[in-house]
Amino acid sequence: MKIESVNVTVFTYPTRRVSDSAGHSHPGEESLAKMAMLTITAEDGSKGYSFAPPEVVRPFVVNAFFRKVLVGQDAFNRERIWQDLVHWQRGSAHQLTERALSFVEQALWDLAGRKLNLPVWKLIGGYRDRVPAYGSTMCGDELKGGLSTPDEYAQFAETLVARGYKAIKLHTWMPPVAFAPNPKMDVKACAAVREAVGPDIDLMIDGYHWYSRTEALYIGKELEKLNFAWFEEPMEEESM
């Protein structure tokens, strides 16, 4: 089943999510945001879709790499297509990113699932038919309606538990917030959430690599006392 075409459609949709200068998401006034839909079509008309930021799948990337590699290949040969794209990465001057490759792979899996009338989880082995979900906060901020204090984190966590979540991951304050990172304030937010939700909810935190080694060690020891299950990306890997 050969691939016949690769196309991208950019569309707008209403959202109340805004991004700061570091790319972190926060609540905001309703506005229009852009999204791109990548469509891979096979010769029999089967289609697969994925959704990406428009800048990741911009026309140059689609024309210079996606179409050059994909058109004419068997849509089921995902690993071969992946390796062929990787071959072009080194000389792409960072145009063909890992994110771009991931959206191609997602669309190919979607195409296979639609063609075979099977969910992708069955195509990759079917070990589980369900997975646990966790609620996730946005990053801390100083915005109205956002997460500006430990108490607001606690209140948001209570809302997530009321919706049925058994686990929660926190994203605390990060640059460009003026006072971030602030390890002691982050620990206060973690403690407030633990007190609010009780001992039976699994808690996690994503440090987004802002802490130093000593700060990460301090936070890790405090999280251990609070029985947190996971401390994600506490510092830059180069800091090891």
PLM region spans:
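Structured beta-strand/loop patches that form or line metal/cofactor-binding pockets in enzymes
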Residues: 1-50
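Solvent-exposed alpha-helices and their adjacent loops that cap or buttress functional pockets
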Residues: 29-32, 124-127, 195-197
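Glycine-rich, aromatic-flanked loop segments that form ligand/cofactor-binding clefts
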Residues: 105-145
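Glycine-rich, charged/polar anion/phosphate-binding loops
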Residues: 22-25, 119-120, 154-155
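Conserved, mostly hydrophobic/aromatic
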Residues: 3, 45, 66, 104, ...
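Metal- or metallocofactor-binding catalytic centers and their adjacent structured scaffolds
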Residues: 41-116
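Metal-dependent enolase-superfamily TIM-barrel catalytic cores that perform enediolate-based chemistry
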Residues: 130-240
